[in-house]
Amino acid sequence: MKVSATKKTVFASEQDRPDIARKRARWKAYQGKVDPKRLVFIDETWTKTNMAPLRGWSSRGQRLLAKVPGGHWRTTTFLAALRHDRIDAPCVIDGPINGASFLAYVEQFLVPTLSPGDIVVLDNLGSHKSRAVRDAIKSAGAHRLFLPAYSPDLNPIEQVFAKLKHMLRKSRERTVHKLWDRIGELLASFPPDECANYFRNSGYGST
């Protein structure tokens, strides 16, 4: 049998804990029973003005060098909702996320896109768990549901963020406003069939 060097796919070791493993097993059993069209996955990720490609081409034996801002760069946060056929409620904020800014996002951007019967799926970040967030989602006739801990593989929006960051690194935007404009342009790079593929890759049935 031939072998070759292969990039590792890394998972959190905590997934092997009995309590986490049980919750993940229950979740996976639930996945096949829910209509993917009802699922709305929301999350946030950082974007920065010092992003650059992580890989490139160089002559064998030569180091590949690149320049990025060292002391003058900004961190912003991108939030969005992934449905089976589209990205909904995209938003960028200046700086890191906190409870107040996440609630404002839910109330002002997410809730207007929700329909009765929608299931809003989130990870276990503290800002996601407030009663105010629950009540805002409930006001639209939707429900809030938390993923098992240490389970980004069960959240298809993580695939969106991975592709988005790859494209942003290639863009090398160095001001906040150019970064935000570029994010808006790149959202067109996620057509309905690709969103459906992200769902299937994470185990959420046929769409």
List the model feature ranges, each with a label:
Residues 1-207:
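Short functional hotspots at interaction and active-site rims
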